[in-house]
């Protein structure tokens, strides 16, 4: 059942990559992509629920037929690996980058073909990099955004300095944390500093576009892009939840034993749920947003472009 559903998920993901592989992505096609992501997320919810049925078995019940599964394992599922690669999972982010050795030549070739094509992550990143509206000849949103960020951090520091209820050592530690956070924000506006951040995969331009979409999501032309990014993150989270529930079930059934495919069992699965995420940079943009009451107002020129031509 899982293989059939993963085949459907792969079909949906490939159709979304076809949409974003075009030089220009029409708004109605973004709506199509959102609908397909919703379908993927409903499938994941079903897959996660099915673990509850499997867990009605006891460990001894599972042991009665476990040996008949050997050496078959989800660890060896070529389709699952193709799905991960199509989404954009890098070999460097895999818990076991030698997984190809467990595949037969025909399946290894399928994986090679998938890896030779632009992943969904790459295509979404390129789409975000083309996002307009952030700057015009007379206006730069990022200058206003940077001023708000700097003022926010300075206010936080001043509040701490004047808070006599917090012991001085703790105040100093909190101020140091704010300083480090500010350094991270400053890297958003400096390509050289941004390139030195090793835990971010998404490009600077794509990250800035994601922030802009998230802050001004209520404007008509940004509503669908925001929904798309939101459902993309939801899919990544569902994938992570599926891995986690898989690891919990495996731990319950076999404890610390080796998995049927030769992996380290529940320990391996638990590690994949933490490390093997694809769209975590989009999710982390939430930590770069600012309160609505301090979001810089956009000039009328940009507001007009982001709004419908005719509004009731």
PLM features: residue spans?
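Surface-exposed peri-terminal alpha-helical interaction modules
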Residues: 2-312
């Amino acid at each position: 059942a899982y293989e059939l559903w993963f085949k459907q998920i792969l079909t949906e993901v490939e159709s979304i990559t076809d949409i974003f592989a075009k030089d220009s992505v029409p708004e109605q096609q973004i709506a199509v992509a959102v609908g397909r992501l919703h379908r993927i997320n409903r499938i994941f919810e079903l897959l996660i629920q099915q673990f509850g049925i499997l867990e009605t078995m006891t460990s001894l019940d599972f042991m009665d037929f476990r040996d008949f599964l050997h050496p078959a394992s989800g660890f060896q599922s070529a389709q699952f690996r193709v799905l991960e690669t199509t989404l954009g999972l890098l070999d460097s982010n895999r818990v076991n980058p030698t997984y190809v050795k467990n595949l037969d030549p025909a399946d290894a070739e399928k994986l090679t073909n998938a890896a030779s094509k632009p992943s969904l992550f790459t295509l979404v990143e390129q789409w975000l990099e083309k996002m307009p509206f952030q700057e015009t000849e007379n206006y730069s949103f990022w200058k206003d955004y940077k001023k708000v960020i700097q003022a926010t951090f300075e206010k936080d520091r001043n509040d701490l300095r004047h808070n006599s209820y917090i012991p001085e050592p703790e105040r100093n530690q909190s101020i140091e944390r704010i300083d480090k956070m500010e350094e991270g924000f400053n890297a958003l506006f400096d390509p050289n500093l941004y390139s030195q951040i090793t835990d971010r995969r998404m490009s600077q331009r794509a990250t800035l576009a994601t922030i802009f979409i998230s802050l001004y999501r209520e404007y008509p032309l940004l509503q669908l892009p925001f929904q798309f990014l939101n459902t993309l993150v939801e899919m990544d989270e569902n994938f992570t939840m599926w891995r986690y529930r898989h690891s919990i079930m495996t731990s319950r059934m076999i404890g610390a034993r080796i998995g049927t495919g030769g992996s380290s069992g529940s320990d391996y699965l638990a590690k994949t749920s933490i490390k093997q995420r694809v769209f975590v940079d989009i999710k982390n943009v939430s930590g770069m947003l600012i309160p609505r009451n301090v979001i810089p107002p956009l000039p009328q020129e940009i507001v007009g472009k982001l709004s419908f031509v005719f509004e009731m």
